């Protein structure tokens, strides 16, 4: 097989100006133009001189291969954007324009507040409907990039007299940004390899399920715009390293600033870019371009990132950012030593080098230890520390482990979200390592680190998806380039690599790159003579079939797995008809219409954002999870018996309690299945009152039937979920009180409340709301009233028994008998 041409190589001159020749040259072209080097190479090969350029104009531009390539590239990118946007609209078509999941409801509520009251009111907004009685300062506790982006688009549309509701802007924001993600991925892959690979990468990321899962219409979450910012920042960084231009580096800093404002995953960037620079230093690939790019990026990016209120001084005071500072100091020391090496003798330089490195390393090490010990540098947060120690969160911080997105990724998830790209991704990585240069070192580090983090946490599959699309596109591009453009390669001799030209242009100012070994023409001919047209056709058809299966899989997964809003459920009958289960919105609307405006609703933290967003009522805890002790108090109330829970609810001024119960319809995401996490979180703060072992049977089982633990059968969560459920018989094959989710008959059917009363139960019993009774004006006496018997039955007592059991009067006064005074005494 012939060596793949390097992506930096200039575009080879084609033999004719037909559209097919332009299409074939697309895989080898980066910028779609013919330079003088290509023409000279063509003449050196003995070919005819290239045709003269056609007259200016549209027809003249399209008559050139570059014109056809530009048109073809634009068309493919437009179709990729259109396909990605269309495939994300299944939820809107099947249901309606609605916000999905949990976190997007808070983002939508914040964006609505921003659009209604302005930016400064948003920054100073104190949300009194969250975390009662504490409240929440929203402006300083969110990444505002998502809200500002949606609010800016809404303002522009209204300025142009295009009346659009802010909800529709939020719903369609992520599908729109998916097209920008495709373009940024195209630009990055083109810088890494060539234009053909970039177009394939753009098509892959437009429809891949790993990215669609967080960017469907209605998923108004930070990741919807953050992946675009991530890819665009990486593209500008690669551009900065290749050119050494301050302009591109400043653009990279601005893109990084937008990324910091949009998502907490910016920590991945501020650790991956320093890792890239550090590895380049280890590989002795230091250059002035790297020095200019990283020094400018770190200083300007650091200052810009600190302008986000939620980030503040974290870039200089947290352990997650210390690697970037260390690499910056190392780069300055390396550059200083490079400066001294040209002005000192070899012996003096070696002495100074070892002495300086020892002192600098010791000073940095002692400084880090001192600053960490004194608390100036904060240690790793629990969420980041759990990336290195996967069992840490489950033992020490159960609230982090309770989130499904923080669970380790299964092998099935990789194939489900990436399909055939999982298999072709290592091939693309091998091609990059085989033809290594500065930017390919970056993509190799990106791939390796993303694979590790995606394996540790399901949520980080999102960071793996872009690099898998890029490397898989490189692999497919090489295969198509070899099996479709073989003849043209043989007629066009290889030209010089642009990296070599860059070295010549800088006249030795840069390091000496290790160039790749090119095959001789005779060796290429021997290799390619064995490839007949049949083999080329078979391989090409196989590749096209794989791509077709990939497209079908992506569409099916998007339609069936990632296009269902969690607030509206759908089920299908045997005849194919669909049933809509709208219990969540039904219950939230009931709360909005039938409760006091200032009513306080207690529920588990999963539903806090939805209650505040749809019901507009005050909640005790929500999905922000910033106060673990407050969440543990709610978990303790749910895990305790009714009397103990009532005291907690009165302390927190709770008016209503909301629980999710799926025993009727078989909904597995209800509160009974989440109950053990409530117990674990409560046990972490109240170990004397709540113990997880009390909720298991002696055999260690968690059961809701008669064999279940008495503590479980009498706790508040169990009673609220199964109240009046023992009277319901779902079908003739199961007894009354049969739980379809856990496939068991409940153990406590005679449930009665003393301090609560049922206020609302949705149509399918999915949402149940209870009202907390006010305390009685006069406490009832627990003891029985005294009963008097007028005619008591007298029992015969013998004298012996009476003497033996003689009673006595407690504290009886003792009178001392006086003596008569005699005459003698006087």
From Swiss-Prot:
Residue numbers covered by motif WWDYG motif: 604-608
EC top class named in words: transferase
Binding site for Mn(2+): 103, 221, 223
Residue positions where N-acetylalanine is found in the record: 2
Name used for this protein in its record: Dolichyl-diphosphooligosaccharide--protein glycosyltransferase subunit STT3B
Comp. bias regions, Low complexity: 37-49
Subcellular locations according to the entry: Endoplasmic reticulum; Endoplasmic reticulum membrane
EC number assigned by the record: 2.4.99.18
Region of interest: Interacts with target acceptor peptide in protein substrate: 604-606
